[in-house]
Amino acid sequence: MRRIDPSKLELEERLVTVNRVAKVVKGGRRFRFAALVVVGDKNGHVGFGTGKAQEVPEAIRKAVEDAKKNLIEVPMVGTTIPHEIIGRFGAGNILLKPASEGTGVIAGGPVRAVLELAGVADILSKSLGSNTPINMIRATLQGLSELKRAEDVAKLRGKSVEELLG
């Protein structure tokens, strides 16, 4: 899989969660902030990143930097995805279904952020299993990265799209 250069894209970022995490030491607890950010250009490119620091803005900056390193390309057919797929990561499963134009993004929380920043305008999604934000995002991105257009599958099989679709 080739790496996507973030400097050539106009990326928009969206903060999904900020968590206060603690490290318990002899003298008490040491608090830090963990941020989860999704970035995308609303045109088929999306990624997520995590960052941890003692201050919230610094954690967010680190998360954005990380997200730009983890961009994936999302194949689209018009305003939706080419086919139904279940993205799996850990205990989090996300069902992604293509929808007709005008349906909108039917998704909850973190999944909505990923799909909107990827540029998918019409889609149905359902969270199955764990709904921990990071697992939902990872499952969604795993599902989106496995999508294939009919043209790509036809090319791999050495057939025309008409032959493939019957």
From Swiss-Prot:
Gene Ontology biological process terms in this record: response to antibiotic; translation
GO cellular component terms listed in the entry, alphabetical order: cytosolic small ribosomal subunit
InterPro entries for the chain: Ribosomal_Su5_D2-typ_SF, Ribosomal_uS5, Ribosomal_uS5_bac-type, Ribosomal_uS5_C, Ribosomal_uS5_N, Ribosomal_uS5_N_CS, Ribsml_uS5_D2-typ_fold_subgr
This protein's record includes keyword Nucleotide-binding: no
Keywords noted in UniProt: Antibiotic resistance, Ribonucleoprotein, Ribosomal protein, RNA-binding, rRNA-binding
Domain S5 DRBM span(s) in chain numbering: 11-74
NCBIfam families: rpsE_bact
Assembly information from the UniProt record: Part of the 30S ribosomal subunit. Contacts proteins S4 and S8.
Family matches, as HAMAP family: Ribosomal_uS5_B (MF_01307_B)
Misc note: Altered S5 proteins have been identified in a number of mutants. Some mutations in S5 have been shown to increase translational error frequencies.
Family according to the record: Belongs to the universal ribosomal protein uS5 family.
Protein name: Small ribosomal subunit protein uS5
Source organism per UniProt: Bacillus subtilis (strain 168)
Lineage: Bacteria, Bacillati, Bacillota, Bacilli, Bacillales
Gene name tied to this protein: rpsE
